[in-house]
Amino acid sequence: MAREVVDAMTMRRALTRITYEIIEQNKGVGNLVFIGIKTRGIFLAQRLAQRLKQLEGVDVPVGSLDITLYRDDHHAVDVAGQAKLNGADIPVDINGKHVILVDDVLFTGRTVRAALDALMDHGRPAKISLAVLVDRGHRELPIRPDFIGKNIPTALDEQVSVALEEHDGHDGISIEKLEE
């Protein structure tokens, strides 16, 4: 049975705090691009951009990445042996920009590694930062987020689920013990 660990109001506050941290750590926000990792990372990137516009009056472009074909547990290649680029919607040239990758949960780091590979196929940003709503620990790769909504330590036999209004009909974060 899942137990809610973050409600909608706490989630909103965490996203607002991330937005303030992004503003504070950047000399202006005109060079930023948010890129959400499919699926919930896209909605979170859009929310961060909306909040940033409310606070700073600046429209920050928002793009999306589907990293399915870049995962190290997926082996789809075309006839030439090249990984197929799939599902990226990046509305601006990212060369020389500060890209902030956005995802819902950081766990092993493998999704972020795949996103970095996919992103580099689209250009060469001046800087890449990582914003996550939840950092649950248990990294398998040396990846550390720059902006964290909530640190939620978990056991390996637990699953963190993020619900977003745009996708799930409500906001919240819950933890559930996996079946053995």
UniProtKB/Swiss-Prot annotation:
<protein>
    <recommendedName>
        <fullName>Bifunctional protein PyrR 1</fullName>
        <ecNumber>2.4.2.9</ecNumber>
    </recommendedName>
</protein>
<dbReference type="GO" id="GO:0004845">
    <property type="term" value="F:uracil phosphoribosyltransferase activity"/>
</dbReference>
<dbReference type="InterPro" id="IPR000836">
    <property type="entry name" value="PRibTrfase_dom"/>
</dbReference>
<dbReference type="Pfam" id="PF00156">
    <property type="entry name" value="Pribosyltran"/>
</dbReference>
<feature type="binding site">
    <location>
        <position position="136"/>
    </location>
    <ligand>
        <name>substrate</name>
    </ligand>
</feature>
<keyword id="KW-0328">Glycosyltransferase</keyword>
<dbReference type="InterPro" id="IPR050137">
    <property type="entry name" value="PyrR_bifunctional"/>
</dbReference>
<dbReference type="GO" id="GO:0003723">
    <property type="term" value="F:RNA binding"/>
</dbReference>
<comment type="function">
    <text>Regulates transcriptional attenuation of the pyrimidine nucleotide (pyr) operon by binding in a uridine-dependent manner to specific sites on pyr mRNA. This disrupts an antiterminator hairpin in the RNA and favors formation of a downstream transcription terminator, leading to a reduced expression of downstream genes.</text>
</comment>
<comment type="subunit">
    <text>Homodimer and homohexamer; in equilibrium.</text>
</comment>
<feature type="binding site">
    <location>
        <begin position="103"/>
        <end position="111"/>
    </location>
    <ligand>
        <name>substrate</name>
    </ligand>
</feature>
<feature type="binding site">
    <location>
        <begin position="39"/>
        <end position="40"/>
    </location>
    <ligand>
        <name>substrate</name>
    </ligand>
</feature>
<keyword id="KW-0804">Transcription</keyword>
<comment type="similarity">
    <text>Belongs to the purine/pyrimidine phosphoribosyltransferase family. PyrR subfamily.</text>
</comment>
<keyword id="KW-0694">RNA-binding</keyword>
<keyword id="KW-0808">Transferase</keyword>
<dbReference type="InterPro" id="IPR023050">
    <property type="entry name" value="PyrR"/>
</dbReference>
<keyword id="KW-0806">Transcription termination</keyword>
<dbReference type="GO" id="GO:0006353">
    <property type="term" value="P:DNA-templated transcription termination"/>
</dbReference>
<feature type="short sequence motif" description="PRPP-binding">
    <location>
        <begin position="99"/>
        <end position="111"/>
    </location>
</feature>
<dbReference type="InterPro" id="IPR029057">
    <property type="entry name" value="PRTase-like"/>
</dbReference>
<comment type="function">
    <text>Also displays a weak uracil phosphoribosyltransferase activity which is not physiologically significant.</text>
</comment>
<feature type="binding site">
    <location>
        <position position="160"/>
    </location>
    <ligand>
        <name>substrate</name>
    </ligand>
</feature>
<keyword id="KW-0805">Transcription regulation</keyword>
